[in-house]
Amino acid sequence: MARYNPFSFTPGPVVFFTTVIYVGLFAALLVTHLTVPDYPSDPPAGINLTEAWADLEHITRRFHPYNSHANDHVRGYLLSRIQGVIATKALDASQVEVIDDLTSNATFSSGATSVYFEGTNIIVVIRGSEDDEPFNSTDRKPNNGGVLVNAHYDSVSSGYGATDDGVGVVTVLQLLSYFTESHNWPKRTIILLLNNGEEDFLNGAKAFMRNPISQVPHTFVNLEGAGAGGRATLFRSTDTEVTRFYSKSKYPFGTVVSGDGFKKGLIRSETDYRVFHGELGLRGLDIAFMEPRARYHTVEDSTRETSMNSLWHMLSAALASTSGLAAVTGEEFSGSESLDNGRVNAGRGSDGVWFDLFGRVFVVFQLHTLFALCVTLLVVAPIALIGLTFGLSKADKNYLLARKAFVYSSDDDNPVQLYGWRGFFRFPIVFVSATAVVVALAYLLVRFNAFIIYSSPFAVWSMMLSAWFFVAWFFSRGADAMRPSALQRMYALIWLFIGSFVLLTIITVFVNNYQVVAGYPALFYFAVVFAALMLSYLELFFAPTKSAYARHFEHDTSSRRNSESASRPLTGSTTAARSDDRPVADDDATETTSLLRGDRRGFTRYGSRRDSTSEGDEDHAQGSRRLDLGNVYPGEQEWSGKLPSWIWIIQLLLLAPLVIVLVGQVALLLTSALYQTPSDGNSPLFIYLAIAALSVLLLAPTGPFIHRFTYHVPTFLFLVCLATVIYNLVAFPFSRDHRLKVYFVQRVNCETGANTVSLTGLDSYVQRIVGELPSAQDQPLNCTTPDVATRKELKTCEWEGLPAKVVPNAAGAAPFGNETNTDRWLEYSIHKGNRSNKATIRVVGLNTRACRIVFDSPITGLAVTGAVSDPRFKPVGAAGSREVRLWHREFGQPWNVALTWDAEEHAKLSGRVVCLWSDANTGSIPAFDEVQHYLPVWAIPSKISDGLVEGFKQFEI
């Protein structure tokens, strides 16, 4: 009885090993992505997680945007905590300096917007043990750089800010405690920055640039949050050298794909990273939480939605990165001389490629290494395959696309059919068919239920993966049943090689020309396909020579010509026959078939050990000496019987694991980053097409083996596909756990008292939401395209809402009454200069520290009383400014704004003076409270701009 080979290329082993590998690795990736490592019961000395959690609960009790009284309370609490840490450890001013920065201000522009901002940052400087130079001296050596760790303590007006950025703030407090332990004291100076005003225009980081201490750090670690809980990912990094310090983290998490997402605008949020690197010149890291985005900037960004594990994940990453950077004593992050443009000379790093493996291992290498490897593979791989093809031809064993073999010469009238071409075009047909189905499903979802991805991303993934696999199996298995081919696996690998070669070529161009490295998995994809294909080439060297195989039938043919009972030709089941003996193609052998045809054996012995005939004996076999063809898989070419039946398992292990891990990681990251962005106005079609493409890349490695699958797994996946298609088409796209974000603002005409409340959101859904609000019922809705550039794909619905009570009638009154006439909410006066194109506007708003001046035509010059000039900042952009945003440290203080405009083009300057109110803690914005109270459970409000309430008056000069 033949022994069973558990690794043979037969249905049982193929189904088992392929299923185990895919299911096991998918499960491991999901566990890594969706769970957070436990925090330690015994953290490092100086770290107190219980204390950190208590701090987080305290600062997130109320909304605390810059323009709120709660913001001042948070600031006072942080100062007291910092002083408490310093006092506990008996540190003096020479070791730790606290800078309560109430003097820095910045005037700058971005596009058509100008900003004047007064900072209230808190800065703690821990002098490094090897830093004995004064911080504010021009004689400070340019290579004596420190490390900046930043978090912002303001929240948005519609969220408590636990993740954005409360966890970052308490992390900074714990770093202060850690690095002021004597045995943890850093060699480099560490600057801990708690900035205020990040949410409104990255204002706090700009104000930090105005402080002289900003010239001390050369590297930075920015702590942020764009979700609620989960793992803190490495959002982006400036260079390879800095990233290597993040790799010291115990639980690294992230991929360079997110960095490219910022570059290409796929991720619309911005962080202080842009200021520190782009304007100050520092090199560093952006570590942030990233999902779920539906809770970002809402009341669900609270301690209830995060955890101690998430806090520890960010803290441990910041601790490892900061410790490493603060221990560098060389000049790796320093230029040779100081710069005179206000930027820090932190040297130049190399663009990098980085990704984690299961949240435990972090891989980092340089971009030019990626480029070199890509070019090398693109050159070496085709040459190697050409060489192997030549070797097979020299050995007379090249069955690829071989149609026939001759016993004596090419003049032989009776060649033996090899059928080496069979199955060559099979894989591209299968691939295109399956891919077309998943692309069609993407368009189907957009047509009938475009936003189901918002709440059910894994249902969409299940649909795409199961659809592609079933369709690919159906066509591949059907073709194999009709025309079996021993070369189907190799031909599939050849087509995969061609496709991945083209993909890698494109990626290489992007790497070289645009420094976009998000396609790094293509390098590994191509490498494993190349390795697997080489094994198939080497496998053919085990086949008999074509000449020996042809002579194998010489005696058989002679015998059959002399026997009337053996007149039936060799058939398609053996797939080797004389060309003139094939009146019927692809018939099965019967009892009339010659018994001397190649020692035909049953499939039960496929893959078992057999005695083989030597090559020399094959070439000289005569008469009754027959060629031992081994065990042929039913229906496949007889010359394939001697091919090793176990090579496929090595090919599967080469192809599947690395592709699943690298592509799967990118797939999960992109899903997390994008699946809830349609509420921001992003196109859902792009998301579905991205999932379809990634599904194809994930499952394409099954192509060479899928024809061996029995119907069981594909049938199950067909049922999964059917169920998920139905669900994805009919299910409501939002839920209590995945709420649709809508954006709130209330605008009050302070001259007439008229107020308009608006919600901006997805078309058709925002109308349903507004219809459930008591104040909007029985009112005509005006739904238009929003005037916010980043929300153009949404709809804004307006109605007359509940009056705002943002200005108290008497000092200290809360909740505020509405007895104060709206005309007194803001005041302005205009003083015209001696020239027709100059004027000064004095603006003051009650109970606010944020106002704007919006112009109908651009201004060309701007100067705010008290502003400090900085050559790094341009008050007005090249095309002028249409809006000036004004921020004070104190409530109710005036701004004096001197303006210049082009009088030749615009004889008059007109526009609006607007003041903002953002404090939703005291019941002073009843319209916002109403929205929060009456919104359906599947929706949640967020702010659309800096203020929840905007009061305005018109002006003309």
UniProtKB/Swiss-Prot annotation:
Positions bound to Zn(2+) 2: 164, 199, 297
Bias kind Polar residues: ranges: 564-577
GO terms of biological process kind: proteolysis
Needed cofactors: Zn(2+)
Subcellular locations according to the entry: Vacuole membrane
Membrane topology, Vacuolar segments: 32-369, 445-450, 512-521, 664-685, 735-957
Record-linked InterPro entries: Fxna-like_M28_dom (IPR048024), M28_fam (IPR045175), Peptidase_M28 (IPR007484), PFF1_C (IPR053975), PFF1_TM (IPR053976)
Entry binding sites for Zn(2+) 1: 152, 164, 224
Annotated Gene Ontology cellular component terms: vacuolar membrane
Chain intervals for the UniProt region annotation (Disordered): 560-591, 603-628
Active-site feature positions: 198
EC number: 3.4.-.-
Pfam family membership, one: Peptidase_M28
Family stated for the protein in its record: Belongs to the peptidase M28 family.
Official protein name in the record: Vacuolar membrane protease
Protein source organism: Pyrenophora tritici-repentis (strain Pt-1C-BFP) (Wheat tan spot fungus)
